């Protein structure tokens, strides 16, 4: 390099390290309608000012790095950088802050949850200047959400396919989750569907193990579906889990399900990955299959209050990536879920337009425009005594799924399904007549059990079962 070139290269470039807040903390910034907005719960290391911590998050999740680089001069950082535009303390927590960050739309590939998350929840979560970091919420602008297909079909199309209206749908996860042969598994599916359930489900652990290979399970479950449909006159389904070790194998299983003529398949979207999930969702729309989503592994990501990512973000990501159902907690069962927080992300799954409501953990107003909605699935430790509360909490556009609460019935699988269907129909009728399920729910169940021996037996066996632990996920 000549002396002349060296002199020219040094002009306008000052090497070294400077505070992130000098570039990435911009409290005067006015957010744009096209910006992706994020709310991070930030716990800085001792001695790190909140403005520096928030700016570091904005920098490390967009254009910044630990030192000034000369190639910054080859682009417009003001156009592409993330900006921490507001910081507020978290009430009741020492040294925790909510940092609001705005990202320009051009930072992200269209239609890719994978790329979105690689930036926003990528390496920044291991940044040493932060003791902990949690992504509480995202605002997805219509300019970005319209680049996604979203759910394969959505709530209304599913109801039309099933010809079922005016009530929640009923499901059951086949138990034991592992160890049954394909034929015995299919028998349990048939008995539950014949008894009155709309769906049965593969457990998320069920893929293609030595005791039951996937193709055998698919065939016996399809036989069970058609037999139950013929006997009941209702459309039935079983969530055939297409999750596999490779995308190619996953698609092969989905294709076989379509060839069998079944209405719905299933995917574990977090363990399977967003790229695989989006590919499957596109296939399902093109081929008329509904897509049930299980959230296995979510608690590894969202259970800790100060680090990770809240489930409402994972729920938004799923709506964009694609799924017609997703598990979302029960409020009343054995799994984590505080009522207002749960209903907040349930609305984010189902509704077209959701107003900002910090009391429910919703940090931003979200407009999904025309993207179809997703049915929330309540599953985990629920039984007939929970039916009034579930009907009142989740409303008609939901799936209520009773695994042990069906298969644990003392008289067998079909009577367990009958008990749940009777309880649901009684609760829906009582609600439609103007009765208060929150106050009169137990009485509604007792009245129905007088003419349904199956329900009476279920009420007796589960009358003492409760899961009374305080929720971790609170505001």
Swiss-Prot record:
Give the transmembrane region(s): none
- A molecular function GO annotation: monooxygenase activity
Which residues, in ranges, are excised as the propeptide? 1-2
Keyword terms of this UniProt record:
Acetylation, Calvin cycle, Carbon dioxide fixation, Chloroplast, Disulfide bond, Lyase, Magnesium, Metal-binding, Methylation, Monooxygenase, Oxidoreductase, Photorespiration, Photosynthesis, Plastid
Regarding how it is modified after translation, the entry says: The disulfide bond which can form in the large chain dimeric partners within the hexadecamer appears to be associated with oxidative stress and protein turnover.
State the GO CC annotations: chloroplast
Q: Where is this site: Transition state stabilizer?
A: 334
Quaternary structure per UniProt? Heterohexadecamer of 8 large chains and 8 small chains; disulfide-linked. The disulfide link is formed within the large subunit homodimers.
PANTHER family listed in its UniProt record: RIBULOSE BISPHOSPHATE CARBOXYLASE, RIBULOSE BISPHOSPHATE CARBOXYLASE LARGE CHAIN
Protein name stated in the entry: Ribulose bisphosphate carboxylase large chain
Organism in which the protein naturally occurs: Picea abies (Norway spruce)
| Gene that this polypeptide is encoded by | rbcL
């Amino acid at each position: 390099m000549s002396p002349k070139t060296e002199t020219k290269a040094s002009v306008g470039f000052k090497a070294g390290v400077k505070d992130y807040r000098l570039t990435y903390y911009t409290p005067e910034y006015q957010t744009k309608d096209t910006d992706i907005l994020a709310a991070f719960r930030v716990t800085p290391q001792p001695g790190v000012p909140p403005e520096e911590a928030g700016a570091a998050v904005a920098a490390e999740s967009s254009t910044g790095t630990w030192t000034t680089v000369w190639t910054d001069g080859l682009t417009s950082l003001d156009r592409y950088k993330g900006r921490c535009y507001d910081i507020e303390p978290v009430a009741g927590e020492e040294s925790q802050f909510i940092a609001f960050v705005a990202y320009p739309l051009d930072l992200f590939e269209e239609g890719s949850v994978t790329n979105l998350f690689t930036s926003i929840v990528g390496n920044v979560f291991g940044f040493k200047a932060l003791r902990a970091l949690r992504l509480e919420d995202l605002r997805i602008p219509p300019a970005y959400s319209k680049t996604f297909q979203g759910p394969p079909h959505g709530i209304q199309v599913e109801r039309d396919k099933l010809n079922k209206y005016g009530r929640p749908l009923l499901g059951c996860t086949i138990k034991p989750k592992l160890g049954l042969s394909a034929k015995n598994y299919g028998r349990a599916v048939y008995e539950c569907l014949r008894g009155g359930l709309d769906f049965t489900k593969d457990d998320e652990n069920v893929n293609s193990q030595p005791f039951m290979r996937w193709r055998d399970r698919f065939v016996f479950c399809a036989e069970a579906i058609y037999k139950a449909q013929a006997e009941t006159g209702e459309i039935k389904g079983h969530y055939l889990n297409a999750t596999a070790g490779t995308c190619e194998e996953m698609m092969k299983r989905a294709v076989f399900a379509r060839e069998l003529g079944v209405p719905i398949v299933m995917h574990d979207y977090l363990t399977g990955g967003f790229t695989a999930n989006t590919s499957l969702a596109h296939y399902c729309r093109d081929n008329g299959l509904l897509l049930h989503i299980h959230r296995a592994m979510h608690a590894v990501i969202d259970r800790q209050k100060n680090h990770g990512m809240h489930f409402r973000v994972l729920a938004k990501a799923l709506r964009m990536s694609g799924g017609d159902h997703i598990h979302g907690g029960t409020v009343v069962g054995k799994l984590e879920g505080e009522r207002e927080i749960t209903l907040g992300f349930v609305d984010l799954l189902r509704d077209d337009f959701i107003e900002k409501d910090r009391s429910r953990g919703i940090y931003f107003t979200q407009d999904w425009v025309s993207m179809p909605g997703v049915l929330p699935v309540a599953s985990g430790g629920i039984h007939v005594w929970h039916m009034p509360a579930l009907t009142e909490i989740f409303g008609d556009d939901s799936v209520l799924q009773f695994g042990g609460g069906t298969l644990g019935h003392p008289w067998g699988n079909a009577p367990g399904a009958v008990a749940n269907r009777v309880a649901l129909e009684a609760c829906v009728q009582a609600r439609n007549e103007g009765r208060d399920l929150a106050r009169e729910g137990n009485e509604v169940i007792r009245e129905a059990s007088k003419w349904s021996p199956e329900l009476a037996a279920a009420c007796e066996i589960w009358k003492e079962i409760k899961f009374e632990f305080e929720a971790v996920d609170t505001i």
